[in-house]
Amino acid sequence: MPIRVPDELPAVNFLREENVFVMTTSRASGQEIRPLKVLILNLMPKKIETENQFLRLLSNSPLQVDIQLLRIDSRESRNTPAEHLNNFYCNFEDIQEQNFDGLIVTGAPLGLVEFNDVAYWPQIKQVLEWSKDHVTSTLFVCWAVQAALNILYGIPKQTRTDKLSGVYEHHILHPHALLTRGFDDSFLAPHSRYADFPAALIRDYTDLEILAETEEGDAYLFASKDKRIAFVTGHPEYDAQTLAQEYFRDVEAGLDPDVPYNYFPHNDPQNTPRASWRSHGNLLFTNWLNYYVYQITPYDLRHMNPTLD
């Protein structure tokens, strides 16, 4: 699926070097097919890096995907040039009257911060409330899962004593579920979080269906039966080097982090890590776009009036 992005977005050249099909807006305008409109609320500090990761995964299906990047934090960024944010990101006020086929809410390094202490917590709640009437399907990733469970289901913040970091094995619970269609019975995916997601908590306090979990009984992938909301507690979008960058950053900060589990060959940080989750990440996002977005979204978004009820 060619993703449609602004002509000058840095990800265009970055992904073309990997032979990822990226279609600029100027080229796409000549095609008579409605692209899927996907809004990405990017909460990660290194926004360009995160854009590259998610756009790579959104590029693997047969239809156009029209990407709109959203920011809700008006503070000056220390990791992303202001010019980039001004050129490629919109504010909520710019899109609040629009409808979208899909919304992705990324993770954020806020695992040890109380919800009410998050600078943009009111804006997060506003976007989630807005999405009920303006988005066909929303995918929450890592910290965004924890935030959404609190806002939508009233589940208090669950925090691990130690950070979960590494590449972990998961198994699917419903082989014929659409979101896990084509998954291996067991698969690997990276995690980098303090948030805790016990499967029992999800089963006891929500109506969500758990589709995949870790060997330790943590929920990894779960969704509503109407496909309107889906949750992934790990980081299937991560590059091969992302966990290494986080590890060495924490080492330099004197935090004495554990070596990411099952990541560096022979558990030696001097060895170059290899991504063992790429096929899983691509299939997950392809399934979400196809079965949770494309198959149920209306052709004319002006007529969309979805509800979570």
Curated annotation (Swiss-Prot):
Question: What domain of life does the native source organism fall in?
Answer: Bacteria
Name the residues annotated as site: Important for substrate specificity: 192
CDD domains linked: GATase1_HTS (cd03131)
| Listed GO CC annotations | cytoplasm
* Gene Ontology MF, one: homoserine O-succinyltransferase activity
Recite the UniProt keywords alphabetically. Answer: Acyltransferase, Amino-acid biosynthesis, Cytoplasm, Methionine biosynthesis, Transferase
| Subcellular location per the Swiss-Prot or TrEMBL entry | Cytoplasm
Question: Which catalytic reaction applies to this protein?
Answer: L-homoserine + succinyl-CoA = O-succinyl-L-homoserine + CoA
BP GO terms, sorted: L-methionine biosynthetic process from homoserine via O-succinyl-L-homoserine and cystathionine
Q: Gene3D superfamilies, per this entry?
A: 3.40.50.880
- Which pairs are disulfide-linked? none
Q: Where does substrate bind?
A: 163, 192, 249
Subunit-level organization: Homodimer.
Task: Please describe what this protein does.
Answer: Transfers a succinyl group from succinyl-CoA to L-homoserine, forming succinyl-L-homoserine.
Specify the protein name. Answer: Homoserine O-succinyltransferase
The opening ranks of the lineage are: Bacteria, Pseudomonadati, Pseudomonadota, Gammaproteobacteria, Enterobacterales
